[in-house]
Amino acid sequence: MAGPLGKDLLGLAPLSAEQIRLVLDTAIPFREISERAIKKVPTLRGATIVNLFFEASTRTRISFEFAEKRLSADTVNVAVAGSSVSKGETLVDTARNLEAMKIDMVVIRHPASGAARFLAERIESNVINAGDGTNEHPTQGLLDMLTLRDRLGDLAGKRICIVGDVLHSRVARSNIWGLKKLGAEVAVCGPRSLLPNAIGEMGVTVFDRVEAAIEWADALNILRLQLERMQAGYIPSLREYNRVFGVTSARLEHASRDLLILHPGPMNRGVEIDSDVADGPHSVILDQVTNGVAVRMAVLYLLAGGKPELADAAQKGVA
């Protein structure tokens, strides 16, 4: 029987505000586990989870693995470069072979938009999207919202601006969908060449100057330039990008209120963000990393059929 999130977590666009709040609320008791000397509860003991990453990842893959192990699940990491995929095996054949070994969940990252949904429609195991092309990265969006909610309280009416390479960013799309469902005002800022043509249809404000975005916002979520997805011509140079759109301490003087600084990583210091901002008093970047494990524990728990009202008991290792 499907849990409160359904069978899979493929994106934030299909979720209701109530489902998003459910994940954020469920993550809070799980966050305490990471503060303990013994960082493990038996909640998913006996479950087998496969991490199937077709793209390079450090934070997301490790965060999922920590979340799985802290819930006592058996974790299998498939190195695609050394698997049968490198010999021409299809995504579905790989997953079906894994499912024949009686797994329970698949966490997938893939360069093709829609890959997670394609897989979820063809296997019975739960599927969690850890990033598919430029489509969505739902757990990153959720952890960003938890980090914002920790500091700002109810996000309704709060102003969040996403700065940088929105065109190639699945993080931006998940944040836009999720934040708007929670009633936040969302804006984007970046070179027009790095903003989707139809960005206005998502109901966001567009800023051409980062100074104006800083003056408007309660928080900035700063994105790196995804050079690996670009052909030549999107920006004149990295130096020019930093000069015009880089978030610096001098630019933060334009803020009309205390401003939170988020970044999903990896950071390119000196390009989209300067070190004194990344490491400064307004930065909650490391809080995002901490919250990432808790949010992913909550998602795993809920997809496995865990009852939200028992999350506190699960956190104590008795449910």
Swiss-Prot record:
Q: Where on this chain does L-aspartate bind?
A: 87, 170, 224
Catalytic activity, reaction form:
carbamoyl phosphate + L-aspartate = N-carbamoyl-L-aspartate + phosphate + H(+)
Q: Cite the HAMAP family for this sequence.
A: Asp_carb_tr (MF_00001)
The record's section on Pfam families has: OTCace (PF00185), OTCace_N (PF02729)
Q: What would be an example GO MF term here?
A: aspartate carbamoyltransferase activity
Q: Which domain of life is it from?
A: Bacteria
Q: Which pathway, metabolic or otherwise, does it act in? A: Pyrimidine metabolism; UMP biosynthesis via de novo pathway; (S)-dihydroorotate from bicarbonate: step 2/3
EC identifiers of the protein: 2.1.3.2
The record's comment on protein family reads:
Belongs to the aspartate/ornithine carbamoyltransferase superfamily. ATCase family.
Record flagged with keyword Transferase: yes
Report the protein name in the record: Aspartate carbamoyltransferase catalytic subunit
Q: Where is the signal peptide?
A: none
Q: Does the record carry Transferase as a key word? A: yes
Q: Which NCBIfam families match?
A: asp_carb_tr, PRK00856.1
Q: State whether it acts alone or in a complex, and with which partners, per the record.
A: Heterododecamer (2C3:3R2) of six catalytic PyrB chains organized as two trimers (C3), and six regulatory PyrI chains organized as three dimers (R2).
Q: Which UniProt keywords apply?
A: Pyrimidine biosynthesis, Transferase
**SUPFAM superfamilies (UniProt xref):** Aspartate/ornithine carbamoyltransferase
| Function as written in the Swiss-Prot or TrEMBL entry | Catalyzes the condensation of carbamoyl phosphate and aspartate to form carbamoyl aspartate and inorganic phosphate, the committed step in the de novo pyrimidine nucleotide biosynthesis pathway.
Q: Which GO terms describe its biological process?
A: 'de novo' pyrimidine nucleobase biosynthetic process; 'de novo' UMP biosynthetic process; amino acid metabolic process
